[in-house]
């Protein structure tokens, strides 16, 4: 076509359709979004495409004057017909180039190439499907793979940016919430709780008012936490009242507690949070396992929770405790000499249990293997960038020079995990047997092997301790059967008593009978001096054979005290003569009941070794949150 035909055609179009400003703006938006192809089908416009070397403005000026006048108004170029906008973003740069004398005119029926989206054409995006990839030739396949790699890199970059944005938003929210939380945490704590390393001074008004109450009142205990020092000193006017002790938690020291009343029970012991040394409070050795009160003070009236005592009952209990203190030492020596088998058995089992716990602590827990990745891939890491560049160079060399080798590598079958049958993992592992496994299966197998090894070591330690404990029981039973038969011949009355003491109690029976034992012991102590002596002397015996500062079988110790309390009740009904002979028998019976794994072998010989081992393993689990008395049978 000539320049005159172009000129006449453009003048015709300018006369037929004078575009408004809105049309111009909408056309601009459509062209920028790549939606111009649909308009071209309906309009049938002539498309004028400048040569790549020539700017669109100067080429059209040379082509036609009417187009130049329309461009002076800012309407003609867009209004006449759409122009290929592939160079529309670089108009300023293209104006500096020398103008081209040629104008390339395309026909109306020709479809324009689709605009670029992110550097890629939409047509190419449609072609990269799985079927097209399988049907295409190797060259096209490589081109598609490169294209997909570029897309993947772009998506990964977007993902990293989104993660960074989310992380920064979360950090801003956390910093905004911190001051509000600090304002809310300044609530005043209730006055009975004492926190931190604080001292309770002697002149506090709360303590003064509590010490000035009636003589028969009971002072509730303050709750002490942390490494505190409760240095409260009670006045002399509190000499006739029962002072409840403070709750002791953790490794605390309670200094200078002056309890002028002789009937105050020892401090309550909450379960310790760690291994805690025993607290010494004026000669009281306290066994710190669970909520159990045990102390070797003989005047604690069998550690009964006293409900609001009257002054008369207080005087009676102080008198009885004074009389119990004045018992002759010969009786205590006789009882301790008779208790030697039980004391030896308890001491041996204590040592065995401590040794087992020591060996269990020495066995390390299973640890997962350390990750083998030496560095994290990051664009900020120079070594990683070097590796990326090296990989690109090697890949290009393989593609350009080693065509055949690359084809053989591509045709190889992918790996598949022998365990989970997956074909994708970050790293393939080959076992010694030749099986190929994925990273996930390999790590789970390693963890399972470590767990099995750990449990086998624990079982070996338990079985060894069980054998030693059985040997100790058999030796003590062989030693104790002969003197038991010799002493059981003169009297026939105490045999049912012995059977009832030897009979094992389960957990619920022990708990339900415990309160009755304590109350019966208190009534007997106030009524008869003989029962006082029999009830208080085993407490001394208990602490002669358990001098350990970290005594851990406190439940068996309380069981011994409760059984002696029941035994004393029967001795009062039987008479003085049978009571003295029964007290000679009790060392053997209580020795039989102190079995810390299972009940006495004399009663449960029919139980199989498997049941004994199961009970033993259940009992030897170190108690974390439950009280110690709940795990003992």
UniProtKB/Swiss-Prot annotation:
Statement: the UniProt record of this protein carries the keyword Repressor: yes
Pfam families: GATA (PF00320), P66_CC (PF16563)
Positions of region (CR1): 144-178
Chain segments carrying region CR2: 340-480
Cellular location(s): Nucleus speckle; Nucleus; Chromosome
Annotated GO MF terms: protein-macromolecule adaptor activity; sequence-specific DNA binding; zinc ion binding
Modification sites for Omega-N-methylarginine: 225, 249, 258, 273, 285, 539
Recorded coiled-coil stretches: 139-174
Annotated region described as Disordered, given as residue ranges: 1-59, 73-119, 172-238, 561-585
Modified residues (Phosphothreonine): 20, 49, 189
UniProt main location, coarse: nucleus
Composition-biased stretches (Basic and acidic residues): 1-18, 86-99
Covalent link location (Glycyl lysine isopeptide (Lys-Gly) (interchain with G-Cter in SUMO2)): 93, 178, 204, 233, 464, 487, 550, 585, 605
Effect caused by changing residue 149 to R: Disruption of MBD2-binding, loss of enhancement of MBD2-mediated repression and loss of speckled nuclear localization
UniProt-listed GO biological process terms: chromatin remodeling; negative regulation of DNA-templated transcription; negative regulation of transcription by RNA polymerase II; positive regulation of DNA-templated transcription; regulation of cell fate specification; regulation of stem cell differentiation
InterPro entries named in the record: P66 (IPR040386), P66_CC (IPR032346), Znf_GATA (IPR000679)
Assembly information from the UniProt record: Homooligomer. Component of the nucleosome remodeling and deacetylase (NuRD) repressor complex, composed of core proteins MTA1, MTA2, MTA3, RBBP4, RBBP7, HDAC1, HDAC2, MBD2, MBD3, and peripherally associated proteins CDK2AP1, CDK2AP2, GATAD2A, GATAD2B, CHD3, CHD4 and CHD5. The exact stoichiometry of the NuRD complex is unknown, and some subunits such as MBD2 and MBD3, GATAD2A and GATAD2B, and CHD3, CHD4 and CHD5 define mutually exclusive NuRD complexes. Component of the MeCP1 histone deacetylase complex. Interacts with CDK2AP1. Interacts with CHD4. Interacts with ERCC6. Interacts with HDAC1.
Function per UniProt: Transcriptional repressor. Acts as a component of the histone deacetylase NuRD complex which participates in the remodeling of chromatin. Enhances MBD2-mediated repression. Efficient repression requires the presence of GATAD2B.
Name of the featured protein: Transcriptional repressor p66-alpha
Species: Homo sapiens (Human)
Gene: GATAD2A
């Amino acid at each position: 076509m000539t320049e005159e035909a172009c000129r006449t055609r453009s003048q015709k179009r300018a006369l037929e359709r004078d575009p408004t400003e809105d049309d111009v703006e909408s056309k601009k938006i459509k062209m920028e979004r790549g939606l111009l192809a649909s308009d071209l089908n309906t309009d049938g416009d002539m498309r004028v495409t400048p040569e790549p070397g020539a700017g669109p403005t100067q080429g059209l000026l040379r082509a036609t004057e009417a187009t130049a006048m329309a461009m002076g108004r800012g309407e003609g170029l867009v209004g006449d017909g759409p122009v290929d906008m592939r160079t529309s973003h670089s108009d300023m740069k293209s104006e500096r180039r020398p103008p081209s004398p040629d104008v390339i005119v395309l026909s109306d029926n020709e479809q324009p190439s689709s605009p670029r989206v992110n550097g890629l054409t939409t047509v190419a995006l449609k072609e990269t499907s799985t079927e097209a990839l399988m049907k295409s030739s190797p060259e096209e396949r490589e081109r598609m793979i490169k294209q997909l790699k570029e897309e993947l890199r772009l998506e990964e970059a977007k993902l990293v940016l989104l993660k960074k944005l989310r992380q920064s938003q979360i950090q801003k929210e956390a910093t905004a919430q911190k001051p509000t939380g600090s304002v809310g945490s300044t609530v005043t704590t209730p006055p009975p709780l004492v926190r931190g390393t604080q001292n309770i001074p002697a002149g506090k008004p709360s303590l003064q008012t509590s010490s000035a109450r009636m003589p028969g009142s009971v002072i509730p205990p303050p709750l002490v936490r942390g490494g505190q020092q409760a240095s409260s000193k009670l006045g002399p006017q509190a000499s006739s009242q029962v002072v409840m002790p403070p709750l002791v938690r953790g490794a605390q020291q309670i200094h200078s507690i002056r309890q002028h009343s002789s009937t105050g029970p020892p401090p309550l012991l909450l379960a310790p949070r760690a291994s805690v040394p025993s607290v010494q409070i004026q000669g009281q050795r306290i066994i710190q396992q669970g909520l159990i009160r045990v102390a070797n003070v003989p005047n604690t009236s069998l550690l009964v929770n006293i409900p609001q005592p009257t002054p008369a009952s207080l005087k009676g209990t102080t008198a009885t405790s004074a009389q119990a203190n004045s018992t002759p030492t010969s009786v205590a020596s006789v009882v301790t000499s008779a208790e030697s088998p039980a004391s030896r058995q308890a001491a041996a089992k204590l040592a065995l249990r401590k040794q087992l716990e020591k060996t269990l602590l020495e066995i390390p827990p299973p640890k997962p293997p350390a990750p083998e990745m030496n560095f994290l891939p990051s664009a900020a890491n120079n070594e990683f960038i070097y590796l990326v560049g090296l990989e690109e160079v090697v890949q290009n060399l393989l593609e350009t020079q080693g065509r055949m080798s690359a084809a053989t590598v591509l045709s190889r079958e992918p790996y598949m995990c022998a365990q989970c049958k997956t074909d994708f993992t970050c790293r393939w592992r080959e076992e010694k047997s030749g099986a190929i496994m994925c990273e996930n299966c390999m790590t789970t197998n390693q963890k399972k092997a470590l767990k099995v090894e750990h449990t086998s070591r624990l079982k070996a330690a338990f079985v060894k301790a069980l054998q030693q404990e059985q040997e100790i029981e058999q030796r003590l039973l062989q030693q104790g059967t002969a003197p038991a038969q010799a002493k059981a011949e003169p009297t026939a009355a105490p045999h049912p008593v012995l059977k009832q003491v030897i009979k094992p109690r389960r957990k619920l029976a022990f708990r339900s009978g415990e309160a009755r034992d304590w109350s019966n012991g208190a009534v007997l102590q106030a009524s008869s001096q003989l029962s006082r002596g029999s009830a208080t002397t085993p407490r001394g015996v208990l602490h002669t054979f358990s001098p350990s500062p970290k005594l851990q079988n406190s439940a068996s110790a309380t069981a011994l005290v409760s059984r002696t309390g029941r035994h004393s009740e029967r001795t009062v009904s039987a008479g003085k003569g049978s009571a003295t002979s029964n007290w000679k028998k009790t060392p053997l019976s209580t020795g039989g009941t102190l079995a810390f794994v299972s009940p006495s072998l004399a009663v449960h010989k029919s139980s199989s070794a498997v049941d004994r081992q199961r009970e033993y393993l259940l009992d030897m689990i170190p108690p974390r949150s439950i009280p110690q008395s709940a795990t003992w049978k």
